[in-house]
Regions:
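Generic detection of intrinsically disordered/low-complexity segments and helix-coil linkers/edges
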Residues: 1-2, 49
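Short catalytic helix/loop segments, enriched in acidic residues and glycine
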Residues: 39-49
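Short, Lys/Arg-enriched N-terminal segments with co-localized hydrophobic residues
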Residues: 3-17
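Short N-terminal binding/cap micro-motifs at the start of the first secondary-structure element
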Residues: 30-35
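Short, function-defining helix-loop hinge/capping sites that tune catalysis or transport
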Residues: 36-39, 92
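Anion-binding alpha/beta catalytic cores of soluble intermediary-metabolism enzymes, centered on
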Residues: 18-29, 47, 52-54, 62-145
Length: 145
């Protein structure tokens, strides 16, 4: 497709304004700082393109354990299910110093991740991967995928 054709398609496309309701889980550690900045980015995109983002904060992870005694409440799951998307920060803390890791496994911060993935029908945690040519024969990934 040529640049001119792409330009004309963009010009002829109807402008669609998006309204998105987000559950926001700031999480632990650096999570609150990163998610706060991500929300600023979304708000800037919204201002520029006429989109609206509405946020409702819910607790998950260590901050939820501190506030409620569990890594993710059923009420928080219900809020997440009612939204269009979930904006999620980091969950958990330093395993050697955080008091959360003295708790039984089902009450640790990561149990909230497992619960929300199950409740929302999510199954993958995708992360980018770099494969160096020198190591391609040692990698279990297939080149054709």
């Amino acid at each position: 497709m040529t640049r001119v054709k792409i330009y004309h398609e963009r010009q002829n496309r109807k402008e669609t304004k998006m309204q998105c309701n987000l559950a926001v889980i700031k999480g632990d550690g650096i999570g609150p700082e990163v998610v706060t900045e991500a929300m600023k980015v979304l708000d800037t995109v919204g201002e520029k393109f006429g989109h609206t983002f509405d946020y409702e904060q819910i607790l998950m992870g260590g901050c939820s354990i501190d506030a409620t005694g569990v890594p993710l409440t059923d009420e928080a799951v219900a809020v997440a299910k009612s939204k269009d998307a979930v904006l999620l920060g980091s969950i958990g803390g330093n395993t050697s110093t955080s008091p959360w890791y003295k708790l039984p496994p089902n009450l640790r911060p990561e149990a909230g991740l497992l619960k929300i993935r199950k409740e929302l029908g999510l199954f993958a945690n995708l992360r980018p991967a770099n494969l160096y040519d020198e190591l391609k024969e040692a990698c279990p990934l297939k080149a054709e995928i």
